[in-house]
A protein has these predicted regions:
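Short, surface-exposed connector motifs at secondary-structure boundaries
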Residues: 92-98, 149-152
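Asp-based, Mg2+/Mn2+-dependent phosphohydrolase catalytic module
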Residues: 1-6, 106-216
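N-terminal helical cap/lid subdomain that shapes the substrate entry/recognition surface
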Residues: 2-89, 95, 106-108, 119
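Conserved SAM-binding loop
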Residues: 16, 43, 99-102, 133, ...
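Short, solvent-exposed polar/charged micro-motifs at secondary-structure junctions
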Residues: 52, 99, 200-202
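Residue-level detector of anion-binding/catalytic polar loops
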Residues: 37, 98, 174
């Protein structure tokens, strides 16, 4: 399967890197203090900024301390982040200025996870605190495309979360490649098991049939 695209926009957690277990541990500890009984992993909030989840679940008067607490907990575990299959090979093959990361994590955490996984950090890196509204709002991917000097319609987004897919579509992104079963029913161009085997050359994104979970 092939797509004509001028730029590549990647979500980070669940697409390029695996930080899921660390996030579960951090949020479980956070919930025990600020939202006892809440099962964070069952809330369907993957891809949403931490500060927006804190607003949903912590008492309003405790927002600042609750937000600082989850930021500290997640940063403590950032060093356990590892690359997901195919991520290093793909991004290492891409010319500078042709791709970036659009993560919901704040800048300190996002950079810590990328570096812990051994991935290159693009100059155009977009994080959750760069935008007024996080995913599923279009802001992250609008900013990512803008930093590459591209129209979103000429870009591809790689996403593993419904909130991220909705963000990409709201931004007018032309191609959305879903990663993993969580986005099988989302508005994606195709779904793959991982980035393994995906290539981009001369404006053509090639997705191997062996990795497809869902195609057009």
């Amino acid at each position: 399967m092939q797509f004509q695209v001028a730029g590549l926009l990647f979500d980070n957690d669940g697409v390029l890197v695996d930080s899921h277990q660390a996030a579960i541990e951090a949020w479980t500890k956070w919930c025990s203090v600020y939202s006892p009984g809440l099962d964070w992993d069952a809330q369907g909030t993957a891809g949403v900024r931490a500060e927006d989840m804190v607003r949903m679940w912590a008492p309003a008067e405790a927002f600042v301390e609750a937000n600082d607490y989850i930021n500290a907990l997640e940063l403590e575990t950032a060093g356990t982040t590892v690359p997901l299959p195919g991520s290093l090979a793909l991004v290492s093959s891409l010319p500078a200025g042709s791709w970036t990361i659009c993560t919901s994590a704040n800048r300190e955490l996002g950079l810590a996870r990328v570096r812990a996984a051994g991935l290159p950090v693009p100059a155009e890196f977009v994080c959750g605190d760069d935008v007024l509204a996080g995913k599923p709002a279009p802001d992250p991917y609008l900013l990512g495309a803008s930093r590459l000097g591209l129209n979103p319609s000429s870009c591809v987004v790689f996403e593993d979360a419904v909130a991220g897919v909705e963000s990409a579509r709201a931004a007018g992104v032309g191609v959305v490649v879903g990663i993993g079963s969580r986005v099988l029913e989302a508005d994606v161009s195709c779904v793959v098991s991982s980035l393994e085997g995906i290539t981009w050359s001369d404006g053509v994104l090639t997705v191997p049939s062996s990795s497809l979970l869902k195609g057009i």
